[in-house]
Amino acid sequence: MKKVILSLFVLMASVASIQAQSLYKTVRESAEKVVNDPKASDEEIQINQFKLTALNYLTMMVQKRGMKKDTYFFDSQAVNLTSFVTDFQVNLEKARNISPAKRTEILKIYTDASKFNPMFKDNDKEKVNCYVNDKTTMTPFCLDTDWEKAYDQATTLAKAALK
């Protein structure tokens, strides 16, 4: 009986691991699909290109620094990145309907959350702020971001700002 329970536990753990691994992969594949879709709008392409760039940066920096990160880390970052970008779009639209000043406030909340929650403390500010410094982008966020912390901060501040 103990062997059966232990076997079931191992099986459940491996299934959970496979499901968790797929979150990062799913976010990445979904973004790639939109970027490569000739029917996608410029807005959709730009937003999903940012997601790909941010995920590539994350992976590159983990490898470059020889860090050991588990699948939970990558999955959490990918899901929080997606939630961050989606909530930004929704809250920016809500703010736009209130006033130009409120729109600017929401934009600053999200941009600051990405800039002031670094994951790697990368000194190459030109690279990590390439989207922040691009005044035409729909995703003015820093690449060197801990997306879980940034999402928590931005969500809390945006909710208060939009009351």
Language model regions located:
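Short, charged, amphipathic alpha-helical segments
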Residues: 44-53, 71-75, 103-108
